[in-house]
Amino acid sequence: MEYLFIQFAGFTFGKSASAYATPWQGFPGNISSNLLGGQNTDTGTNNIQYTAQFGNGVSATIGLDDPTVWDRTNVYNLIPSLALNATLGGNNAYAGTHAPDVVGNIRVDQAWGLFQISAAAHEVNASYNSLGLSGLPAVAVTSGSPGGASEPSGHPDSRWGGAVMAALQIKNLPTGAGDDIKVDASYAKGATKMVIATSGTSPSFAMFGGTSVAGAYQSIGFGATTDAVYLPVANGGDGSLHLTEAFGIRGAFNHNWNPYWSSSLYGSYSAVRYDGTAKAFICANYTTPSKAVSADYICNPDFNVSQLGLVTRWTPVKNLAFSAEVQWFHLDQMFQGTALLGPSGPKPTTRYEFKDQDTIQLQVRVQRNF
């Protein structure tokens, strides 16, 4: 069940859209659920919120969201024994939830359109420096369950991150009745789910393609989505959480050709950035001698994602719609050179070129509302 809540006297209790979200969530014009660039809680999140109405379409909402399921990505512990895999994936070292996300918005919703400013505060907390049954804190082991050496090894201090978003909808366009433009822009630090968001959990990326480099089997591009990374002092780090930054923008122009046909042109741009210390820790973990990297190899975990799509809908009768969507997806990764990698099967362990990747997806949907 997506939404289940009760409302009275301005309060909302239950599973509903976050107070941070826009009315269109992650769907300014698209039908696919993977348009990045901002937050999306269209399947609902457990929350408590209060809305004050000031008249003339002006309102303010403040709420508490449960971040456990939908508002967290990953925290990487970069000790050498927890090695990042071939596509920069790591073991998630997020600790348990200590505090809810504090979220809110100020909204103006009038005949001309809508304007909204949202903000969120999100706590990032990590598990122990070492997970294992025995040994000193400096001896990192790969067990995924806390053991006798875990608590004495300590853990990074929790840090608070957050996000802000500005959203705009313009109605009554001269292009036709019911046409509108929707756009929102977001920035997050330690709350990457507010930018790299889908209807499910935040994705990390691993894509393969062709190559023209001699000796390389294929090309590979990847991007790791995290809220923070850390390297314990006992393993040569500073023991602190380094919060990941992300920013994005997405929007759509929605046009009605006639009462039965409509189209939406939409797009987005998203970026994930690691600070200099985080990059050094990630690259030290990833760039092992076994990868036999090329002379022109550069390690940089930052990445960007661009999306552009078109949807056309036919509504022959009320509450019945046939839709077709085509979307281009571009992954702009920052690694360079080649390396000997062992991705998961069926891909072989061999030499790959680091390269940007593209794909196109087609989606067809029939929707009947009752």
Residue ranges and their predicted role:
Residues 1, 39-43, 95-99, 155-163, ...:
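Transmembrane beta-barrel outer-membrane domains
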Residues 1-83, 96-114, 170-172, 185-187, ...:
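Outer membrane beta-barrel
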Residues 2-4, 44-48, 100-104, 162-166, ...:
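Hydrophobic, lipid-facing positions within transmembrane beta-strands of outer-membrane proteins
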Residues 10-11, 22-26, 51-56, 69-74, 103-112, 126-129, 166-178, 191-196, ...:
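Outer-membrane beta-barrel proteins
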Residues 11-13, 60-62, 104, 113-117, ...:
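Transmembrane beta-strands of outer-membrane beta-barrel proteins
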Residues 116-308:
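Detector for outer-membrane/organellar transmembrane beta-barrel domains
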Residues 356-370:
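Outer-membrane beta-barrel "beta-signal"
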